[in-house]
Amino acid sequence: MSNFSPREIVSELDRFIIGQNDAKRAVAIALRNRWRRQQLEGQMREEVMPKNILMIGPTGVGKTEISRRLAKLAGAPFVKVEATKFTEVGYVGRDVEQIVRDLVEVAITLVREKRRDDVKAKAHLNAEERVLDALVGKTASPATRDSFRKKLRNGEMDDKEIEIEVADTGSGPSFEIPGMPGANIGVMNLSDMLGKAMGGRTKTRKTTVKDSYPILINDESDKLLDQDQIVQEALRVTEDEGIVFIDEIDKIASREGGMGAGVSREGVQRDLLPLVEGTTVATKYGPVKTDHVLFIASGAFHVSKPSDLLPELQGRLPIRVELNALTREDFRRILTETEASLIKQYIALMETEEVKLEITDDAIDALADIAVDLNATVENIGARRLQTVMERVLDEISYTAPDKTGATFVIDAAYVKDKIGSLAKNTDLSRFIL
């Protein structure tokens, strides 16, 4: 687990997300507290629980992005789920325990990738031997193998086609065991059970020497790895470092005096309670305790209020962070300052057609103004509005770019207003188009 200080975490998030300092600070402290807990010994380590976070703010201001970037930064298993996808146990649909099962799958992939890196050098040598076997046969003399090995390493054989045998990882037939809890835990994979007994199935693939290396290195890495050890490590990582982001939590809040669908909504909240508080979930790899998994919930709370959530669930989300609606200046900074801003993306996309795109400062001001106006008059969808506006402005250039190789387009405020001004003024039209 990374041991960035809260200040470093915030400055890393600043590269991708504009503003929202309170939210960044809250998640930075939460992440640092995970690291602090890892340094504790024995009983105290067990007692320290993560402080779960509730983010409140309109759509498109960076709630999901903050969590996504945080998980990348931490190198921790992370799943993002929509609260609306789940139903109360007993109804048709996914139950909330599936969240933990998904988290374990993510952790296994993470741990396997890390372990593969550790054995990469050895796996590379083994892969080279298998390529030589395919080229000259297993019975070739050492001298022949050495001469071919030199050619291989010089890249002379890259385009030669060879046949290689690799492990067959096809899912094979699987069946559901009736009466087992959860959606996936009861699915036993027959090929998993029989594969070990039969010594593993292989299949032959035709490929070039160059393309065969990644496949063979993965195959050889997996042979060098202890799968049971990976699973045990993944279960530990899930329990100690897992992060779950629950989006749209306001949609399962029962409105005051609301009837009808409220029952199953409240049911989802009730099912979430033990998960957030700490329970043991059965997965096909073994039981997972959720006591130390960090939960970050977020919602716009347009119609409902945080106080409409079940009181017990509110108590289990002790840190409240409010995210602000974006201002004109924020839009400007989103277009210019972020690491992979929309403007940089469009310039890079046009460069693939050998078309140069220049966007002036007054054009950026005009784009920000239009985005703010539309959010105020039509519907506030936050930073996502910029994508709609940019796409509309660059529509003509994107369409004709292949025919204009070598051309340079300068986009200024007049161009932006010409393309979008009339639509933005006509509220009825912009409701449908922008």
Curated annotation (Swiss-Prot):
Binding site for ATP: 18, 60-65, 247, 312, 384
Domain of life: Bacteria
Record carries keyword Transport: no
Alphabetical list of SUPFAM superfamilies matching this protein: P-loop containing nucleoside triphosphate hydrolases
GO biological process, one term: proteolysis involved in protein catabolic process
GO CC field: HslUV protease complex
One family name in Pfam for this protein: AAA
Keywords associated with the record: ATP-binding, Chaperone, Cytoplasm, Nucleotide-binding, Stress response
A single GO molecular function term of this UniProt record: ATP binding
Protein's cellular compartments: Cytoplasm
Signal peptide: none
Protein purpose: ATPase subunit of a proteasome-like degradation complex; this subunit has chaperone activity. The binding of ATP and its subsequent hydrolysis by HslU are essential for unfolding of protein substrates subsequently hydrolyzed by HslV. HslU recognizes the N-terminal part of its protein substrates and unfolds these before they are guided to HslV for hydrolysis.
Known partners and oligomeric status: A double ring-shaped homohexamer of HslV is capped on each side by a ring-shaped HslU homohexamer. The assembly of the HslU/HslV complex is dependent on binding of ATP.
Record-stated family: Belongs to the ClpX chaperone family. HslU subfamily.
HAMAP family: HslU
Record-given protein name: ATP-dependent protease ATPase subunit HslU
